[in-house]
């Protein structure tokens, strides 16, 4: 109370140098290279809004970090015919922690920058009425900042560095336009998102007869090849679009598979799969005076009143012995069927 903890001083200096080159190896085969160098100087000085009960004071914020990143990207494009294209690329992406990563982290072990090695190979096809594509990717992470399932004091999601993890999968897309007034677009991603070696920290407690609580030693549990939190294996998006003489209609559908809410892959701490549909209807007309165009419409969200949660928090601990494990979760339930109207004017 009566302490302006938010008046800490922060300064971030970000410098970038880019170099880009393209080269035609043949009339149908080309290569490219994008090079980026980044230098970041990041300082935070002051106190945090978190209280250190051992020192009887607000936690200090003393961040003085410098980052130097070299992020190259190289690739090949092969235009086999005017309709068919193959491509391949390799890139490095490095990213510094955000301010929240520092303020929510442990001052004795501030978060590290994450590094990604990205490998991609893909194919696309396009003609006037059909587009299709497939993209295969493998993303190899060092110190990836992943969600933990926990929240800070104001409800923001917390993250932690994971030394060795990966995301791999295939992205598929299809677009069909058989006539002027109808189009069908669909895309899907199947992925495998894993932590190779995860060490779970499980706090323990003993509940005394006088209703006080005694903290027990934190137990470290090793896990192999666990799901990354909030990373579904399957995403599917579908859209039907109609457009005829000023009338527009579209039906958007999304399927999301089961998600784990922590990185320990606990079956009790998951978000169930869900399938949600939104319907949009609109009509556009052109008045003869003043306005060039008027659009009237409405959107019905969650058309079939699906009961689902798309976010939440989760944690675990033990009482007296590790075998007496407790798992806890909170869920962000989403709205049922709801309607939003809209009007737009063009002068």
Language-model-detected regions and their locations in the chain:
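Signature of Gram-negative outer-membrane beta-barrel scaffolds
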Residues: 1-79, 97, 200
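Gram-negative outer-membrane beta-barrel transporters
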Residues: 27, 138-140, 160-263
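Short loop/turn motifs that connect adjacent beta-strands in outer-membrane beta-barrel proteins
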Residues: 28, 83, 129-131, 181-182, ...
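Transmembrane beta-strands of outer-membrane beta-barrel proteins
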Residues: 31-35, 72, 86-88, 132-134, ...
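Transmembrane beta-strands of outer-membrane beta-barrel pores
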Residues: 37-41, 90-96, 127, 136-142, ...
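Membrane-embedded beta-barrel scaffold of Gram-negative outer-membrane proteins
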Residues: 79, 85-91, 112-183, 189, ...
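C-terminal beta-signal and adjacent terminal beta-strands/loops
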Residues: 194, 255-261, 283-347
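C-terminal beta-barrel architecture of Gram-negative outer-membrane proteins
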Residues: 229-289, 304, 309-314
